[in-house]
Amino acid sequence: MLSPNRAFDPVADRVQSAVMQLTDGLHLAYCTNIHRGEDWAETFAGLERHTRAVQARVSSGGPYAIGLRLSDRASRELIEPGTFTAFQEWLKRNNAYVFTINGFPYGQFHGQRVKEQVYAPDWSQPERLEYTRRLFRILAQLLPPGVAGSVSTVPVSYKAFRRTPDEEERALLQLWDCVDFLDALSEKTGHDLHLGLEPEPLCTLENTEECVAYFKRLRDVRPGDRRIDRHLGVNYDCCHLAIEYESPAEALARLQSAGIRLSKIHLSNALSVSPTPEIRQALHAFAEDIYFHQVIERQTNGSLVRHADLHDALATPPPAPGAPLPEWRIHFHIPLHSEPRGGFNTTADHLIGVLDAVHAQPGLCQHFEMETYTWEVMPAGMKQRDVVDQLVDEYAWTLARFAERGFQPVG
């Protein structure tokens, strides 16, 4: 299995003077969707208990960036004037700022079955547009001067929802409505505001080829309207695109060639295994009932087979004894610093390839978010003493990788 032991030098990679704005205008945070937060009180409690503890251990006193997750309910409660003012004062008092919001999960995200409901409402439904607008209204008032703001969202829909042509058309129009809204709000506030569709296996947008095709459909709705290039892009989740067996360099170049903005990059790792009988048995510890853990199997001839969930992959018959084994890449977010052992691997090479591309082209993306939301459902052997310990080690690993590529803390 995977060990929580650090896959880095704990001396060379210690986090003693880190702030979360890096050179070349890069911003780095961890996504607070790792903590429970179904209403604002629970969200704020997580910030007070966990985020401040992480900040105390990784920041030397410079401005500390927060990647905020807000459910629909939490966002409605936060916009109440007294509550919002109190949060602004809390940020100021703690020398913290918000530059990005995770607007993917609309409702409950911890403690009960989520699975396909994480994609609902999708972009064919008015609730998704209303929720996303509200998130941007919140973000625009939280952003420091001169800092751009991003929100990540569902990849249009989930393929198994089987949306009708009318519903597909409605999704296109609602995304354009959001572009209109962001253009007006950006003009009003002076902030560069952009929404990122987050490709994910088995969704409307699974990979960069599907992203390019979908953005062509969007542009065909309003030929010549270039505002889409500024306000709508892709939230590139390294775990998700690695599961699709994409080459980082080719995937990023494909998006760039199509004029699609990289709104944000999720720094995340997936599981990668050869499904021997022993590995299949061990994988049952990851086949839990809250989140989808899609599996994409690359067979020995290079063809890809998609499984909706890890349970489904484990239910398939194993290859005959002695037959070549396929590779399974599994949608289970693994701590960035986890060290492979016992036949388990991660897709960290994909993440490193993305950072190499950013190093070669620093203007590629400015927003980076570590996203390992699976803390509560990880097998016990993977967990460290506390979620704060995990996050601190993820910061250390990530900042070391940025430093190797010349990106240093500012402040």
Locations of regions flagged by a protein language model:
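Active-site acidic/histidine proton-transfer and metal-coordination neighborhood
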Residues: 2-5, 9-13, 112-233, 243
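Non-catalytic accessory regions flanking glycosidase/transglycosidase catalytic cores in CAZymes
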Residues: 15-96, 233-235, 397-411
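Acidic (Asp/Glu)-rich catalytic clusters
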Residues: 19-23, 48-65, 79-104, 139-146, ...
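Charge-rich, low-complexity N-terminal segments
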Residues: 26-31, 98, 104, 113-120, ...
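Hydrophobic faces of well-ordered beta-strands that scaffold small-molecule active sites
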Residues: 26-32, 62-68, 98-102, 149-153, ...
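Active-site beta-loop-alpha junctions enriched in small/polar residues
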Residues: 31-35, 69-73, 103-106, 154-158, ...
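Acidic/histidine-rich catalytic cores of soluble enzymes
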Residues: 182-318, 325, 334
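Flexible, acidic glycine-rich loops studded with aromatic residues
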Residues: 305-410
